Amino acid sequence: MKKIYTIAIALLVAATSFAQSGHRYSQVYSFNWQSSVPLGKPAEFIPSMGFNGANFNFGFFVTDNIAIGADFSWGYNQQTVDPEVYNIGDNCAVYAALYKTTQNIPMKAQFKYLFNPTGFVKVYAAAGLGATSYTEYIQIQEYQFSDSSWGFLMSPEVGIYVPFGKHSHWGANVAAGYNWATNKAQNLYFNVGLFFSVF
């Protein structure tokens, strides 16, 4: 936890240090690898952190500070349970390993606020509203069962844009957020990837 605070403070100091040395953005697009920590219903099914995710995000700036856009993610997690005897219906039982899989697809409109629009390293906070699709799969040999649901989604996020050079359109994007959904498909997520900006 101490290390996380140290990194966060260092990033904020860096953003302040470059306060007037960056370009204003008119558009920004990011492409990220996403990892997530399941909460609520997903954590009851598979409690471990998932590392198989992707994210695409874009925003159009209506002022120097404010962008309106959208965010799309896909997350996949899997767990293998050691072999044991399972009852698959009347008079039918199998001894096999059990494979659990979850798939989460959040889609949201997003409002983004840049705290330092002319800074070199740009720090932002965002809020999203939308919907999420969540599916749980269980497979035992050739038998497969699934449970799917849709839910209304609310999602706060914080992040930074770090360009590869003073006049570079490309850079690194790091973000963290929380997905809350009415179908109880909650998770904490972490994005690491690339962004492309239009000045």
Task: List where the protein language model places each region.
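Short glycine/proline- and aromatic-enriched beta-strand/turn motifs that initiate or cap beta-hairpins
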Residues: 20-68, 187-189, 195-199
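Gram-negative (and chloroplast) outer-membrane scaffold detector with strong preference
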Residues: 29, 37, 57-140, 162-168, ...
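Transmembrane beta-strand segments that form the barrel wall of outer-membrane beta-barrel proteins
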Residues: 29-48, 129-132, 170-182
